[in-house]
């Protein structure tokens, strides 16, 4: 594995800035070059999975959509099950749902009702922490299922959007780990 001190540098070097996407004035952080690089992608998933030794977990939850791309290999590396949290209407069968507010409107996420239960210790994985709205809804959803949130891990945090300040009070001491700060 890549030396721990060099991992943030490696990851940052594989993220491409795309100006004015998806709209003028936005600098989009494209992680597809990182995903295409097997050394960088392995370093990322190994680093996120390593937290299992510090904070025991039973399952990994990935938030739609890029949280699936990161969360599934983290679960495999950690020897845990992977649970997708999806936009409403995308999962068949019985689901639990959680509504949340967006800047302009609202949204809803779901999980299969049988996928989480009392005694589960869950790590939430996503690509980016921005305002924290989706992550907050996921925390509420996981707790409503009877499971415990034992951490939130993201590739990068957009600190200027205040997601950490929103989430830390409701994480009840569970760690919020961002490998890169933007």
UniProtKB/Swiss-Prot annotation:
One Gene Ontology cellular component: cytoplasm
Localization per Swiss-Prot or TrEMBL: Cytoplasm
Pathway where this protein functions: Purine metabolism; AMP biosynthesis via salvage pathway; AMP from adenine: step 1/1
Keywords: Cytoplasm, Glycosyltransferase, Purine salvage, Transferase
Enzyme class: transferase
InterPro entries for this protein: Ade_phspho_trans, PRibTrfase_dom, PRTase-like, UPRTase/APRTase
GO biological process: adenine salvage; AMP salvage; purine ribonucleoside salvage
Entry's EC annotation: 2.4.2.7
A GO term for molecular function: adenine phosphoribosyltransferase activity
Family, similarity comment: Belongs to the purine/pyrimidine phosphoribosyltransferase family.
Function, in words: Catalyzes a salvage reaction resulting in the formation of AMP, that is energically less costly than de novo synthesis.
Subunit structure: Homodimer.
Protein name, entry field: Adenine phosphoribosyltransferase
Lineage of origin: Bacteria, Bacillati, Actinomycetota, Actinomycetes, Kitasatosporales
Gene: apt
